[in-house]
């Protein structure tokens, strides 16, 4: 559905050129909810704006639904953008228009008849759960309600792709959850491809099928959400998954070696592994960190253990006897 090939973007600044994107290549399949996550300044918003040519890349190719955007005429690009809509952090509603007129606006620009536009707008207000707000003004709505109106407006032209640039960053956690559930429901009902730009791991965990981690304008890691967040392989991924630094805690390498265990289903997360190591093998481990989380609607657990050097091989052999537990040795950080 969306294919980015070797995208680079350079901005001119007073001090010289700044590389915002460096050879980024991604493929997003039709109907996916795809997350792009990274710290501030990683290049996330620049990347999503390249997907509809709000930002033109310095080099590289952007393909959407089998068409290369940069080779389109101005008229063809306008038509293509009706199928690649976008919502933002700050809603961008027209404050002097009612909610109904806000949703009608893109249809008016497309030349749709007024009666047809209003009928479609009312259907969309129903779809996003606000049929009673047609005559209300944006200032009369909560932040979550304003974002629902923005989503309805984005769907007005029956797009194939919905780009969400930090769409929940200005919302409280409960409202964020509600908006994410709405986006997922629309994805399932309409088959629309969704790209989520965020710096919040919780957003990606809740809604996305796949994720790419951006770091310094480059793709540090990508794949299924469950695989990337259960066992991040890149330094950028580890910073996101272990924001408190649990992955970098120092233990004495002369005394113990560390392993990360990934429990890949709800049954294995319930195994009292450390207790069994102590009871059955007389091996006493240092639990550095442990967590259980839901990723892509499945339960995963992770544990970082310090195992005495003298018993390391025997402990790893014992753990590997359990199915669905992945064992990975972790280097010490100084």
PLM regions: where:
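ABC ATPase "signature
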Residues: 222-223, 231
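ABC ATPase NBD coupling module
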Residues: 13-18, 69-85, 109, 114, ...
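Conserved signature/switch motifs of ABC ATPase nucleotide-binding domains
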Residues: 136-139, 157, 164
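Helix N-cap at the start of a conserved alpha-helix in ABC-type nucleotide-binding domains
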Residues: 173-175
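Helix-to-loop junction immediately C-terminal to a conserved catalytic motif
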Residues: 52
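Short coil-to-helix segment of the ABC ATPase nucleotide-binding domain corresponding to the Q-loop/switch region
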Residues: 97-104
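Conserved ABC ATPase "signature" region
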Residues: 67-68, 104, 108, 115-132
């Amino acid at each position: 559905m969306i294919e980015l090939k070797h995208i680079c973007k350079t901005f001119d600044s007073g001090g010289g050129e700044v590389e915002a994107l460096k050879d980024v290549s991604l493929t997003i399949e039709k109907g996916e909810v795809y997350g792009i996550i990274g710290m501030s300044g990683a290049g996330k918003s620049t990347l999503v704006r390249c997907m509809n040519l709000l930002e033109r890349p310095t080099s590289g190719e952007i393909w959407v639904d089998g068409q290369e955007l940069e080779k389109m005429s101005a008229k063809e690009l306008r038509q293509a953008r009706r199928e690649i809509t976008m919502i933002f952090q700050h809603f961008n509603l027209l404050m002097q228009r009612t909610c109904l007129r806000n949703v009608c606006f893109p249809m008016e620009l497309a030349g749709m008849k007024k009666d047809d536009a209003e009928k479609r707008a009312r259907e969309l207000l129903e779809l996003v759960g606000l049929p009673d707000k047609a005559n209300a003004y944006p200032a009369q709505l909560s932040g979550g309600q304003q974002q629902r109106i923005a989503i309805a407006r984005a769907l007005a032209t029956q797009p194939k792709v919905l780009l969400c640039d930090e769409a929940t960053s200005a919302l409280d956690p409960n409202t964020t959850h509600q908006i994410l559930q709405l986006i997922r429901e629309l994805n399932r009902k309409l088959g629309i491809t969704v790209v989520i730009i965020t710096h919040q791991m919780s957003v990606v965990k809740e809604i996305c099928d796949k994720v790419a981690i951006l770091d310094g304008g480059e793709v540090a890691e990508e794949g299924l959400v469950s695989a990337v967040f259960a066992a991040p392989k890149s330094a950028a991924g580890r910073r996101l998954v272990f924001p408190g630094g649990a992955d970098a805690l120092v233990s004495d390498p002369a005394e113990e070696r560390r392993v990360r265990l990934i429990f890949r289903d709800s049954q294995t997360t319930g195994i009292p592994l450390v207790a069994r190591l102590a009871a059955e093998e007389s091996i006493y481990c240092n639990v550095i960190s442990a967590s259980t989380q839901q990723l892509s609607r499945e339960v995963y657990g992770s544990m970082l253990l310090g195992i005495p050097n003298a018993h390391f091989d025997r402990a790893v052999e014992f753990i590997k006897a359990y199915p669905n537990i992945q064992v990975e040795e972790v280097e010490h950080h100084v």
